[in-house]
């Protein structure tokens, strides 16, 4: 997963977002949460997607959430098998490690990133460290971070937390509220359009939109993104909340 697109906003309408995040005990996700999606391209069912909170790991002394995002699908002679993993600090939500394994048609790419928030650097595939940011986010951890935020209708928010500084600021535009029906049921939803200066399913050119449940859980109900081979849409079909209590 990569960036998100927002339309232009007047400077006075854009709110910088504090790096502070809710206490761990109030997070809307927990270990064992698994969200399963139906994957469509141009309204044709082509496969499945999952978002999972796999566990709690220790990364260089930091206690970290380990999350995974997978999309598997096939249409005619084109297949998609993408796998992403993120590890981010349970307290600050700063990304510590990010893994991409992209297999789309004839395109394949695997990358591993290590982030070092304490010295604001990152490295790619074991290469020398490059300048980063102090509270980094990657494409996967960004979605979990957004789930912790209060989102005000009509507002645009800026984040200078993407781990590659040249891709900042990341913007998030709150577009509208609506009631939608997905295979998992009917939900009140809040629709956002994020933007990172990057390529992928959340790039500016993709005009991506994400529907989160308009409640304290902020479940990702639907995601739509324009890709070279058509419009990809994920719709929630099964919810396993893991260790999160009612």
Language-model-detected regions and their locations in the chain:
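Bacterial N-terminal signal peptides
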Residues: 1-5
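Acidic, serine/threonine-rich low-complexity disordered tracts
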Residues: 12-117, 151-246
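Hydrophobic, well-structured mid-protein blocks that either form specific transmembrane helices
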Residues: 105-150
């Amino acid at each position: 997963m990569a960036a998100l697109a927002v339309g232009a906003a007047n400077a006075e309408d854009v709110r910088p977002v504090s790096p502070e995040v809710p206490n761990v005990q109030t997070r809307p996700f927990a270990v064992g949460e698994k969200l399963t999606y139906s994957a469509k391209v141009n309204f044709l069912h082509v496969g499945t997607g999952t978002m999972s909170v796999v566990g709690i790991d220790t990364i260089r002394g930091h206690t970290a959430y380990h999350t995974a995002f997978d999309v598997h699908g096939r249409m005619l002679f084109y297949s998609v098998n993408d796998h992403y993993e993120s590890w981010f600090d349970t307290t600050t939500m700063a990304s510590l490690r990010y893994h991409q394994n992209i297999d789309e048609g004839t395109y394949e790419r695997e990358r591993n990133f290590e982030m070092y928030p304490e010295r604001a650097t990152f490295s790619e595939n074991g290469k020398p460290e490059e300048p980063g940011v102090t509270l980094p986010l990657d494409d996967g951890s960004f979605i979990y971070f957004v789930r912790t935020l209060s989102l005000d209708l009509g507002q645009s928010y800026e984040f200078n937390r993407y781990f590659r500084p040249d891709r900042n600021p990341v913007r998030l535009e709150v577009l509208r509220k609506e009631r939608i029906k997905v295979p998992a049921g009917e939900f009140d939803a809040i629709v956002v359009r994020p933007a990172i200066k990057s390529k992928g399913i959340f790039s500016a050119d993709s005009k991506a939109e994400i529907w989160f449940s308009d409640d304290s859980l902020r479940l990702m109900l639907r995601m739509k993104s324009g890709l070279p081979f058509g419009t990809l849409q994920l719709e929630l079909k099964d919810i396993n909340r893991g260790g999160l209590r009612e």
